[in-house]
C-alpha cells in the first residue's frame, strides 16, 4: 500500500518529563504497493489456531489468486497506537482508562512499540518528538496521564486520521490502533466518510471501545463499529468503564494471535483495480486435512485514497 500523508493539522503538543528508555531500532521493510492483511484464525469452538504455515493460507484480490510476499506467524512485534478521547465526557473514567491501558501494554509482546494520542478538539502527542514510540513502562504511563486532560469537545475523525499517519512511522509492518471514545464528533475538520476511506486505504487494523453515555445524543458507536469492521478489527461496547480492562486484555490476546500476510497485487488484479478503486480481498485458511477454519480480516481495501486531515508532525 502507498503511504498515506494527510495535510497538516495544528496540534497542541504536551511536554513530558524525559525518562531513560531502552534504545531499540526495530526492523522495518516496505514496498510502495504492498498490501498487508492481519488475519485472525479460529476453530469451530472459537479458539485461536496457532502454528499454521504460509501454505495454509490462500489470498484472493478481486477473485484473482495472489502470491504472498511475506508471512508473519503469531506474536510478531507490533506498532500500537492508543487513541484516547480526552474530551470533558471522559473525566469520570480517566483513572480506569489509564490503569486498563497499562495492563494492556503489559499483556502485549515486550518488543512492541507504543504511541499515545489524546484528543478533544485538538490532538495531543505526549511522547517527546525525539522518542515518539516507546515500550518503556514509566514513559508510557506519563504519556497516558498527560494525554487525558478530560476537557473540551471531540474531534475523533481528526484523531483517527492522525493515528493512521503516525502508526506508519513505526518500525513494524504490523500496525494497530486502539480507539477509546464514544464515537461522537463535534470538532473535526474532516468528515466521517473521509476518515473511513482513509482507514480502508491503510494497512492498520483498528480496535474500538465505545464508552457511551446513554444520555449523550452526540455519541456515535456506529462509527466506531464501522471503523473496526472495515479494517479487520473488533468493536466493543462495555456496559460500564470497569469492563475496559477485561476488554483490553481480549484485544491483547487477539493481536498476539494475528497472522500477518503481505502481498503485491498481481498484474491481473492491478489491471482490474484501475477501474475499481475498492479492491475486494478474501483469505481462505485450511488445515492439512482440508478442514476450513474461521477467518477474520478486512474484506476490502481502498486504493488511491489518502485525502484527509490529521497529520501529526
Feature annotation, model-predicted:
Residues 4-14:
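Sec-dependent N-terminal signal peptides
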Residues 18-313:
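Scaffold/interface architecture of coatomer-like assemblies
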Amino acid at each position: 500500500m502507498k503511504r498515506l500523508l494527510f495535510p497538516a493539522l495544528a496540534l497542541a503538543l504536551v511536554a513530558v518529563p524525559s525518562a531513560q528508555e531502552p534504545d531499540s531500532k526495530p526492523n522495518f521493510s516496505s514496498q510502495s504497493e504492498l498490501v498487508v492483511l492481519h488475519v485472525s484464525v479460529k476453530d469451530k469452538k472459537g479458539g485461536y489456531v496457532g502454528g499454521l504455515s504460509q501454505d495454509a493460507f490462500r489470498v484472493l484480490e478481486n477473485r484473482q489468486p495472489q502470491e504472498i510476499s511475506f508471512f508473519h506467524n503469531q506474536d510478531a512485534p507490533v506498532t500500537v497506537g492508543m487513541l484516547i478521547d480526552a474530551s470533558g465526557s471522559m473525566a469520570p473514567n480517566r483513572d480506569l482508562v489509564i490503569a486498563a491501558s497499562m495492563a494492556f501494554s503489559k499483556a502485549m509482546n515486550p518488543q512492541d512499540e507504543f504511541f499515545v494520542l489524546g484528543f478533544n478538539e485538538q490532538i495531543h502527542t505526549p511522547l517527546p518528538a525525539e522518542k515518539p514510540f516507546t515500550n518503556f513502562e514509566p514513559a508510557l504511563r506519563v504519556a497516558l496521564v498527560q494525554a487525558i486532560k478530560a476537557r473540551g469537545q471531540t474531534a475523533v475523525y481528526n484523531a483517527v486520521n492522525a493515528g493512521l499517519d503516525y502508526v506508519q512511522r513505526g518500525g513494524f509492518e504490523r500496525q494497530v490502533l486502539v480507539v477509546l471514545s464514544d464515537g461522537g464528533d463535534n470538532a473535526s475538520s474532516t468528515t466521517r466518510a473521509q476518515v473511513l476511506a482513509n482507514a480502508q486505504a491503510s494497512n492498520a487494523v483498528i480496535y474500538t471501545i465505545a464508552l457511551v453515555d446513554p444520555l449523550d445524543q452526540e455519541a456515535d458507536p456506529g462509527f466506531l463499529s464501522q471503523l473496526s469492521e472495515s479494517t479487520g478489527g473488533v468493536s466493543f461496547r462495555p456496559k460500564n468503564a470497569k469492563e475496559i480492562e477485561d476488554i483490553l486484555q481480549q484485544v491483547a490476546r487477539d493481536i498476539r494471535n494475528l497472522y500477518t500476510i503481505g502481498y503485491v497485487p498481481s498484474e491481473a488484479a492491478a489491471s482490474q483495480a484501475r477501474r475499481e478503486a475498492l479492491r475486494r480481498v478474501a483469505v481462505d485458511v485450511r488445515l492439512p486435512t482440508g478442514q476450513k477454519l474461521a477467518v477474520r480480516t478486512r474484506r476490502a481495501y481502498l486504493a488511491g485514497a489518502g485525502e484527509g486531515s490529521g497529520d501529526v508532525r
